[in-house]
Amino acid sequence: MSDPEDKPSRLHAGRIDGGSNDDNGLIGAPADFVRGALADRDPLPGTTGFAGFLAEAPIDDGTEPALVRDVLGRQPLFIDRGVEPGGTANDRLPRWSTDPTDLADPKPLPAGAVLTPGATMPWWSLPSPEPAAPSAAQAAVDRALRGVVGDLRASPTDDVAVAFSGGVDSGVVAAALPRAPCYVAGFEGCHDIAAAREAAAAMDRDLRIVEITHDDLRRAIPAVAAATGRRNAMDLNIAIPLFLVAEAAAADGFDRLAVGQGADELFGGYSKVVEPATDHRVEADTVRGARDETVATLPVQLERDVVALRAAGIEPLAPLLDDRLVAAALELPGELLATPAERKVALRCAAAEYVPAGVAAADKKAVQYGTYVSREIDRLARRNGFKRRMDDHVGRYIDSLCRESMMDDHSL
């Protein structure tokens, strides 16, 4: 652990104004590793994501400076739409950063893309393998999870805390980090705190509860909106509990927060993938097709979640988005993804090696509902005169808080 006041820059060498021709500014993987993935066009080369600047990226038959972002967008990268490139290797590219607030007019580099001085090119795409036989598919998930857990257990993790809600995703992450304290956020009496208490007791883990108040919401709403550039209620309902957990862990001196992001998307955790042919929320009519639709939403979600966590002063660690688990998940047949009786079938089976049966089988509410954050933001909106009969009453309340925060900032 380190003093939260002494944290390194979140840019991770991600310059936005220059750098010498032989400099690289990457987060998530070494430059040589990313060059190899570029040369081979390998979308899953064995990382948990990467993004940044390469001075000499192997593009087609030559090398040139480039910005890159991995195939799932696990490391967000933003470019400035409003600044013309310059003339040196780095300056021939747009201004860029891993933090959108560094830029005047940020937009995300698409997941799997390479941006050179001449073009933005889709470089990597996710594999679309045929489903493996059930026994082989389950064995592949078991092996992948065993490798991820083993690597984490063998790594220095004194600076890591775990975001913990008592479900199978955070349970497996916590099991891979046996000495890390677990943090859960929510309003008094909420599902997530109750589930986390039960799971932590079953796993004999140190659980630290971040009890959210209305004052916390009034403070966090403009902070998260400013950090992410998003003011819609759904994004804030999801990001605020993460932000408040991360703040608490950072205040306790932790540098990294391990999260369960990606499990629902990869392994069939959403109700809409169970019977997609009759569910209007997806276009696909098969479980695998519906799962693929949810995987495609990950880059946009991670642009929100990763940025919100970093704004709280902590670096996210998402072991369930490891390439090994991604590759194994993509080969799962529908019956090991979701059925009317159970979702995330293969992941729960693999997790049984690491967590108690009750944790492996636990149902989990979406974070915005399990923490009561969505309910309580709605309550605050109505108390402040934004009634449900109004169009987008919660969105209007959020806008009012953001305007007040900006006025307060300008008066300082």
Task: Go through each PLM region and give its residues.
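Cysteine-centered catalytic environments shared across enzyme families
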Residues: 1-209, 214-215
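Charged, low-complexity surface segments at secondary-structure and domain boundaries
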Residues: 18-20, 124-130, 279-285, 313-314, ...
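Polar low-complexity intrinsically disordered regions enriched in Ser/Thr and small residues
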Residues: 55, 105, 115, 349-350, ...
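Short linear motifs in intrinsically disordered/low-complexity regions
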Residues: 81, 100, 265, 364, ...
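ATP-dependent adenylate-handling active sites, centered on carboxylate activation for C-N bond formation
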Residues: 134-354, 370-372, 376-382, 393-412
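Short, surface-exposed acidic
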Residues: 355-367
